Amino acid sequence: VLGAPALADENTLLGDMSEIDHGGFGGPVVKFTQVDGAFAVLSGGKGGWIIDHRFVVGGGGYGLATRHKAKGLEVSGQDLEMGYGGLILEAIIASDQLIHFSTEVLIGAGGVTTTRGSEEDAFFVAEPGVSLMLNITKFFRMGFGASYRYTAGVNFGDLDSGDLSGGAA
């Protein structure tokens, strides 16, 4: 079978992408939250593909950076470890303005264990949030946001889904 270039434009699922600005980003994230009723810090990062300065498809992942006792587990000297990540979908509102907003949702999975890994559990996570964004330069933006982490399926010692769910800033 021989092929020849077609003279007409080829139809594609996303259409003519040459008319749409797109690029990528990545960066660190620090979140202040609560785990099992105690102050906690999550550190991690997120990145994605920015489509037409309005929509982001990406991913993110976060891990517990503070020490917490593993409630309900009879293992001395072991701390709780937790992490989660997933797909991020984000809508950016008025990205050309000095200060603008975005709204996002992370949908994914996480895990909780002890420092020695003697017990472990996996869970579902959904984390909607909003951010206030500041354009520092054309290629550098800083965001300040709030989110709520919903977890489901947690059965780890005396911890349940409510203990790992919570607001974050």
PLM feature segments, named:
Residues G26, G45-G47, L87-L89, T103, ...:
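Membrane-embedded beta-strands of outer-membrane beta-barrel proteins
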Residues L7-V57, A169:
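Short glycine/proline- and aromatic-enriched beta-strand/turn motifs that initiate or cap beta-hairpins
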Residues G3-P5:
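N-terminal signal peptide c-region/cleavage motif recognized by signal peptidases
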Residues M133-A169:
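Predominantly the C-terminal beta-signal and adjacent terminal strand-loop region
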Residues R54-I136, F140:
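Gram-negative (and chloroplast) outer-membrane scaffold detector with strong preference
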Residues V29-T33, Y62-L64, L106-G110, S147-T151:
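Outer-membrane beta-barrel pore domains and translocons
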Residues H22, F39-S43, D79-G85, I99, ...:
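Residues that define the transmembrane beta-barrel architecture of outer-membrane proteins
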Residues G15, F32-D36, E74-Q78, R116-E120, ...:
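Outer-membrane beta-barrel domain signature
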